[in-house]
Amino acid sequence: IASRMIQGRANCTLIHQSNQGLSAARNTGLEHAKGEYVTFIDSDDFIQEGTIEALLAVLDMHPEYDILEYPVVQHHGNKQCEKLLTFSEKAFTSARDYWLGGGYQHTYACNKYYRRRLFEGVRYPVGKVFEDAYTLPFLLAKAGVIGTTGRGLYYYTDNPQGITARAGGQELTHLLEAHLRHLAQWGTLTAAYYESLLNIQMDVYEATKAAPVLPVLPY
């Protein structure tokens, strides 16, 4: 099917690779990427027609953007959980302002366009769950301007059998480790972010009974 789809499309490359997980697939794509910007679409998901053109138009208007985040339908297909996460037209020159302003709540790799050079020396960790939360802060640290837009739309399909939906102790530990890895990057934390981390820590303890590792801060 993939071979037929790329016939006659000189701008498409078909890569064959054994299934090594999401991070390995993205990393292989990054090794072969040639354009100025890169983005990702997971195998269960899709984008609204016209999204690519709309986002490239935003990037043409704002060549200073190193990362551009756009709206996403969360848990598409699950009417009880489906939710639209949208954004205003905004630019952040501080990674800290973006992250503590709520960016930590939507660390998805897929509803963003990245300047390809940001991935120089940065790859997704193979074998870890919540790899997005681990990798995004590295990219934010290298970005000069992070933009958000209300244009375009990504559909994040609900998968009750997916790894994140069935996250247990090990997976939640990966998520907590991802946030702790970058804690010093943000300086003084907001109470809302610390509360989010505390909730993750409590979930980890509930699942594993391992001693808490989240630093105790005066909130």
Placement of each model-derived feature along the sequence:
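Glycine-rich, basic loop-to-helix element that forms the pyrophosphate-binding segment
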Residues: 1, 17-33
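Acidic donor-binding segment of Leloir-type glycosyltransferases
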Residues: 1-16
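Acidic helix N-cap motif at the loop->helix transition within catalytic regions
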Residues: 1-5, 28, 46, 50-52
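Residue-level signal for alpha-helix termini/capping positions
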Residues: 7, 31-34, 60
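Nucleotide-sugar donor-binding loop of glycosyltransferases
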Residues: 18, 71, 150
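Donor-binding/catalytic cores of nucleotide-activated saccharide
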Residues: 22-23, 43-146, 157-170
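Short aromatic/hydrophobic "clamp" motif used to bind/position activated sugar donors
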Residues: 38
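C-terminal subregions of glycosyltransferases and related glycan-biosynthesis enzymes
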Residues: 157-219
